[in-house]
């Protein structure tokens, strides 16, 4: 299914306004997040400098589009893997009432995530500084991951957090179908592909359900 491509900053802001109807406070939080992200990127490699002129398209709308695929506002925990710059996790936390768990193993990035959450007053954000393998298992409603790991490894590592009602939201760039085809058939059937709103050549894997080791053995 084709979607309208958000190819400029005005279009990205307009789409966010229409899709999520942010309050004045939420718009302010998004603007503040952008400012903090740009400032911190001069200190550590959070985003490519080439994307700074198009922050609303490349980072804010790119993150917000995942929330549009799971509108269960306030329903269960959102687990964001390899949160890094807080994309999409902090954008989700700003635009929704969802409790968001940001998992990141690098200390400097965790320090940044905590400082932004505090600065923006995001009481619905928890930052966990550890590799995913060392985090206690808990059921989550949504799992997102932006440039975290190859798809098969991502699913192996995060399967224990999934339930029958878990929604998987996984941006995979140009290789979505290729990575999906390498999965066991039971896993493949759990996912479908959606076109990204921010890049004509990028796709998002959308899945539903519980991933199990037993399914992995079925080809």
Predicted feature descriptions by range:
Residues 155-168:
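A short glycine-rich, Lys/Arg-flanked "PGG" loop and its adjoining helix->strand segment in the class I
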Residues 97, 163, 184:
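Short conserved AdoMet
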Residues 151-152:
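Short glycine-rich, flexible loops that bind phosphorylated cofactors or substrates
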Residues 99, 124-126, 167, 188-192:
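Conserved beta-strand segments of alpha/beta enzyme cores
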């Amino acid at each position: 299914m084709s979607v309208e491509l958000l190819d400029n900053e005005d279009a990205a802001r307009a789409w966010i306004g229409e899709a999520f109807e942010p309050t004045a406070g939420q718009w302010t939080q998004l603007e503040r997040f952008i400012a903090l992200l740009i400032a911190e990127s001069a200190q550590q490699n959070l985003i490519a400098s080439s994307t700074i002129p198009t922050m609303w398209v490349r980072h804010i709308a790119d993150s917000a589009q995942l929330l549009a695929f799971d509108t269960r506002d306030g329903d269960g925990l959102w687990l964001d893997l390899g949160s890094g710059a807080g994309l999409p996790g902090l954008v989700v936390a700003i635009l929704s009432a969802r409790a968001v768990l940001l998992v990141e193993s690098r200390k400097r990035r965790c320090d940044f995530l905590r400082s932004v959450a505090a600065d923006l007053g995001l009481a619905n954000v928890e930052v966990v500084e550890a590799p995913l393998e060392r985090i206690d298992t808990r059921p989550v409603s949504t799992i997102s991951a932006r440039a975290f790991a190859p798809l098969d490894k991502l699913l192996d590592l995060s399967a224990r957090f999934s339930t029958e009602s878990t929604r998987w939201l996984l941006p995979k760039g140009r290789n979505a179908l290729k990575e999906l085809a390498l999965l066991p058939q039971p896993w493949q059937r759990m996912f479908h592909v959606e076109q990204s709103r921010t890049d004509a050549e990028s796709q998002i894997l959308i899945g539903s359900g519980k991933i199990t080791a037993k399914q992995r053995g079925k080809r």
